[in-house]
Amino acid sequence: MEHSRAQYGRRGMNMGNVIGDPFALASISIAMLAWVIAFISSIVAAVQTNDLPNLAWWILALEVGIVGAVFFVIASDTIQTYHVALTAYQTLALATLSILLNRIVYDGRGAMQAASAGYVLLSVVMALWMIYFGSAPSASPRAYVDSFALQKEGHGSRNTMTYGTGRPETSTSVQPPQMYTSAQLNGFENPSPVGGISQSQAPRNSAVPNLNSTGVTANGKPPGQDQEVGPPTEYPYRAKAIYSYEANPEDANEISFSKHEILEVSDVSGRWWQARKESGDTGIAPSNYLILL
């Protein structure tokens, strides 16, 4: 499992993820400009008035860390990995900004007013980021914002845009092991349900006697049971693709689809959904490429 995660999740930073996303580019630029205004104005206010609260310096340090973290997360396409931590720090920053602004925004001196303007801009950006990073990818506001991202339409991004640590093992990609009693499995070689995981194997020459004594068939399953679990027959949900996606050629379980294509979905509880196209093709699709109708 760790090998598959490394295979899907190791990616470097790509400036195209920031430049090709209007929301990311605009919000990061405004945040950097607001921080510079607040920093310079705070220095001037501290020198001229000596009334600037010490909380301002803590906020400036916190804000530069948050802006840098947001830039890194978007550039490396690891939003799904770090969005909880980002939302927590942005909430903390917005709370402390509110306390600071309550103490300086009503000061009529020019340096304080300039500093207040910078901190107000930072507050607005923090509030927008809290909504964006705190929302699920399928949420309508976030899906609408993401629809303008040019980089997510590229071929390379379609193949590599994952959840940071790679696609988790789901029931569609890994078949669960069949449950038998110890008497039924005595003397059998138990094949691993996950490729690459070795299990202890019993001698093969003991399998024939146990087949006859327990009534288990030669395929290792009781009579009347199928060898594999088939795909679901009901697809109660409908979803619209907000990006195009090209299935990984090394994973036969994935399904390709184009932007704005309508898919039928059987289960929406996981990060990868079992879907069916209008052509009848079935497979799993990443949930952050789809929005429920």
UniProtKB/Swiss-Prot annotation:
It is a multi-pass membrane protein. Residues 155-233 are annotated as: Disordered. Residues 157-189, 197-217 have a biased composition (Polar residues). The keyword Cell membrane applies. Residues 234-293 form the SH3 domain. One of its GO terms (cellular component) is plasma membrane. The chain crosses the membrane at residues 23-43, 55-75, 81-101, 114-134. Forms homooligomers. Plasma membrane osmosensor that activates the high osmolarity glycerol (HOG) MAPK signaling pathway in response to high osmolarity. Belongs to the SHO1 family. This is High osmolarity signaling protein SHO1. It comes from Verticillium alfalfae (strain VaMs.102 / ATCC MYA-4576 / FGSC 10136).
